[in-house]
Amino acid sequence: MKRTYHCFPTFLFLFFTLHSFSQTHTLSGTIKNRDSREFVSAVSIIIKGSTEGTFSDARGNFKLATGKPLPLTLVFSSIGFETQELEITGAADVEVELVPSSVLGEEIVVAATRTATRAMESPVTIERISAANIRNTPATSYYDMVTQLKGVDVTTSSLTFKTPSTRGFNYSGNTRLNQLVDGMDNQAPGLNFAVGNFTGLTELDVDNMELLPGASSALYGSGGVNGTLLINSKDPFKYQGLSFQIKTGMNHVDKSQRSKPGWYNDWSARWAKAFNNKFAFKVGFQLVQAKDWIANSTQDYDRLTRKVLPGSRQTDPNYDGINVYGDETNMRDNGLSMKSLAQLVQGQTRQGILDATGGMVDIVQTMNAALPAVPTQEQIGLFIGSLPEALQRPVTNMVPFYFGLRNNIIPEASASRTGYVESDMVNPNTLNFKLSGSLHYKITSDLEASLTGYFGTGNTVYTGSDRYSLRGAKIGQYKLELRSKSWFVRSYTTQENAGEAYNATITARRLNEAWKPSTQWFPEYVGAFVQARSMGADEAAAHAAARAFADQGRPAAGSDEFKQLFDKVRSTPIPAGGLFLDRSDLWMTEGQYNFKD
C-alpha cells in the first residue's frame, strides 16, 4: 500500500503537466480601419511561423483557437492595407488598427495565366469586379455589372438572360465566350452557351468576377474566342456568418407595355460556418420575381434579305412581323404564289376530270366555250347544274380560280397566315430560384477537399433564330475538388432539363395548322380574293376580305379554344409541336500542376 501512495501523486503530477501543455487558447479581437474607424472584414489572421489562421467577419471580429503556447505573434493582412504583426501574451480581446495602403497593381488575380498574378504583371487586359463593388452597385444584379465594363457588348433577351461579349462580336446565346463559375464551365450542355445568370452563384456568395476581353482559347478552351468571364464564390473559411438581402423595385412605369407598373423582387440569403479552421460549409438561395419586358415590335420583316420593310398587315399580304408569331408560314416559302396556287388547283381539277372521263371532258375548254369571261351567278349555276352530279362539286370549287386566271386578276404575290403577338404566346413573368451549397475540409494545412453544388430553375425567355419561352427549365452543377497550393484535381457535371420550354414561333405555326391547315387556308384566301375583285374591290380591299374569309374559325387569343389548342401544341415535341426537349448532361475531369512552385 505504501508503494501505491507514492506513485499516485506522481501520476497526477504527470497528468496535469501534460494537460497544461495541450491547453487550447482562444484568441479574439476586432479589426478596424485606422483612418475611417470602420470595421474591416475578410482580413487574414495567421499565427506567424505556422499555417493556422482564420478571417475576420463582416463586423471585423475574429476568433482563433490554437494549442500553441503563449506568447505568440499574429500576422494581419488584407488587400488595401499594410501587413501588421501583433504579439499576443494573453487571452484578452485585442483591437487591431490596419493602416490603409494604395499600391497600384498589387491586387491578385487568377485569370490571365490560370495562376496567381499581380494585375500590373499580367500580360493581358483584365477587368475585375470585387465583392465590395457588387455590394455598392446600383445595378439590378451583379451580372449586370459586367455589361458596364470596358469593351463589353450585351444582348438582353430577358431580365435573367443576358449575353455579354467583347471586341464587338455579340449575339444572343454567344458560343464564343467562356463563362466559368468556380472553375466549372457554366454552359448549358444542350445549348452550348451559358444561360446568363440563370444558374450559378447567388449574389451574396460572389467574391469577385474577372473578365478577359478578347481571345483566351489557349487558357480556357476554344469557346473563349471572344473572351472569358470568371465568377468566383466566397470561401466559407474566410466569409462566415448569416447574411440576408432584399431588393425591391418597379419597372414598366411608363406603361408603354403594361397597363400598370410591375414589381421587381429579389430575395437572397447565405450562411457559412467554419469549425476550428478545419471544416466549413455554406448554403445560400436567391429568388427573383419580376414582370419581364415584352417584345412588341410589329415591324414587317423580310427573312430572305433580313431587312425591315415599310409595311404592315394592312398593306402587305405577305406580312411577317418581327414579334408576331405564326405569320412565318406563307405561300412563297412553299414555292407558291397566289397565281401559281390558282393554276395548281385548276390543273389538279382538270386532270382529275380528264382521268375520270377517260379523257373525254376537258373542263377548262368546256367552260371557255360555254361561259363568258364575266358571267352572272345564274349563268354559272346553270352550267354547273348541266354537269354530271359527280363533277359538280369539284367544278364549283374550281370556279373562282378559273375566272381569276381567265381574267388575269390574280397577282404573282404571296400571302402569309395571320399570326399572334408575343404577349399571346409567351409568359412574361420572370421567375428564377437558385440554391447553392458546399462542404470544405482541410486534410492538411496545404490540402483541401470540397464538394460543391449549384442549382437554378425558373422561367425566362431566350432569343435566337426564334423566340423561346423557357418554362420550368432546370440546370444543376456539381463538383468534387481536391486542391493544394500548387495543384488541383476536379471533376464536375452539369445536368440540364429544359422542362416545359417551347419555341414560340413553331408553336404559333403549329397552332394555326391545328385549327385550319394551310392546304385549306391558302386556297380559301385566293378564292375569296378573286370573288372580291370580281365584285369591283381594289387589291387592298380584296386582300382584307380574303383574310377575313380564310380566318373564319380562328381562335381568339385568350379564349378557351385558344388555350386548349395552345397547351396541346406547346406540350407536343418539335417538329409536330413546339416543345423543346432537352435532357443533356456534361461530365468533366481536369487537373493542373504548377511546376513553378
How would you describe each model-predicted region?
Residues R59-T66, D93-V94:
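Short, surface-exposed beta-strand/beta-hairpin micro-motifs centered on an aromatic residue
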Residues K63-A65, I126, Y143-A188, D207-N208:
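Extracytoplasmic beta-strand/coil segments of soluble accessory domains associated
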Residues L204-D207, A218-L230, D235-R303, L431-F433:
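Outer-membrane beta-barrel translocator/receptor signature
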Residues F62-A65, D185-P213, A269:
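Short acidic/polar hinge/loop motifs at secondary-structure boundaries
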Residues P310-D597:
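Outer-membrane beta-barrel domain signature, strongest for Gram-negative TonB-dependent receptors
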Residues T30-S36, V43-K48, T73-F81, T89-R135:
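Short, acidic, small-residue-rich periplasmic hinge/interaction motif at the N-terminus
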Residues T51-N61:
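Short, acidic Ser/Thr/Gly-rich low-complexity loop/linker segments typical of extracellular
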Residues A92-E97, Y142-M145, K162-G168, L177-D182, ...:
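N-terminal periplasmic accessory domains that precede
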